[in-house]
């Protein structure tokens, strides 16, 4: 069977488990919005993990609260959806409870624990300022780190990610990071991080509880760490980030709770669902047209700062 999943660390761990226990033999990385917009053709030969639900798939695993809210599917699907820290945890729990997989899946427990930490952003200051091992590897796979936009590596980011599920089954993080294609990215991260911090400060403003990061119109954003902003603005408890979408056809707006000041009560998945996106309580994203982006951002800031978390508008289009 084929697995459809995201190309972030959580999706990669889902892939490692499902391939490692013999459920899938092919892996395809797709964007969640393409799934929502029915741009991905699926069949009963497909397993979907860490992505929106598609009714004609064989099995589906997810943990995003927006999907629970959107579909009311618990108990009505082949697979599982749970509001836990990672989709990898959902996959692990499902097969741990089922023979003949209950024993073989146990070898992935440590990896799933790491996926929980990564996807729920339970990082320390040391993890962000000096990432190593199982912290550095997820940052390399994070789409927000901008590795995919740098075209001077020996192999593309997609080619690199295709190798990772098998590597996660057999090697430690340090062994993986010592491989040339990964070491190349570690070097690039260390080279770019100071420039990224400078550009981040130049393009960030504070709006009450929120850090607003606006990278729209920037042709080059250095490789960086999306959690750095929380250390630069420790009094704020949530970030709102705007970047150009693919081929500048739309604006992607991402929201995330601070990992330093964990006082935000905004349900980000619920909020972004109202704009055609999704996520879980602490993080999520949506895509809106350029003409609507400023209005959407201001509306989100009003919701965040007025604590009016039940309000959102459906007036906005995704693409111009």
Give residue spans per PLM region.
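Long, charge-rich alpha-helical interaction segments
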Residues: 143-183
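Active-site loops and adjacent core secondary-structure elements that bind or stabilize anionic groups
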Residues: 200
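Short, surface-exposed loop/turn motifs that are enriched in glycine and acidic residues
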Residues: 182-190
């Amino acid at each position: 069977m084929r697995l459809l999943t995201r190309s972030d660390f959580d999706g990669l761990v889902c892939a490692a488990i499902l391939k490692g226990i013999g459920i899938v033999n092919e892996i395809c990385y797709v964007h969640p919005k393409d799934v929502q917009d029915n741009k991905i053709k699926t069949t009963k030969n497909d397993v979907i993990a860490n992505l929106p639900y598609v009714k004609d798939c064989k099995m589906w695993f997810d943990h995003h609260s927006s999907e629970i809210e959107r579909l009311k599917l618990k108990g009505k699907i082949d697979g599982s959806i749970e509001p836990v820290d990672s989709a990898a945890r959902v996959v692990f729990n499902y097969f741990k409870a089922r023979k003949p997989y209950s024993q073989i899946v146990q070898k992935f427990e440590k990896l799933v624990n790491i996926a929980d930490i990564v996807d729920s952003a339970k990082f320390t200051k040391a993890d962000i300022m000096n990432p190593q091992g199982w912290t550095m590897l997820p940052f390399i796979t994070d789409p927000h780190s901008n590795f995919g936009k740098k075209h001077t590596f020996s192999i593309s980011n997609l080619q690199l990610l295709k190798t990772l599920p098998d590597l996660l089954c057999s090697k430690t993080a340090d062994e993986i990071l010592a491989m040339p294609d990964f070491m190349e990215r570690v070097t690039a991260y260390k080279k770019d991080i100071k420039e990224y911090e400078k550009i981040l400060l130049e393009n960030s403003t504070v709006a009450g509880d929120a850090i607003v990061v606006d990278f729209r119109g920037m042709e080059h954003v250095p490789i960086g760490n999306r959690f750095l902003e929380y250390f630069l603005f420790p009094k704020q408890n949530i970030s709102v980030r705007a970047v150009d979408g693919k081929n500048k056809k739309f604006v992607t707006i991402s929201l995330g709770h601070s990992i330093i000041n964990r006082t935000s009560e905004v349900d980000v998945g619920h909020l972004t669902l109202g704009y055609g996106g999704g996520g879980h309580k602490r993080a999520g994203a949506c895509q809106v047209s350029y003409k609507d982006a400023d209005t959407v951002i201001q509306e989100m800031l009003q919701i965040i700062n007025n604590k009016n978390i039940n309000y959102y508008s459906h007036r906005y289009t995704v693409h111009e």
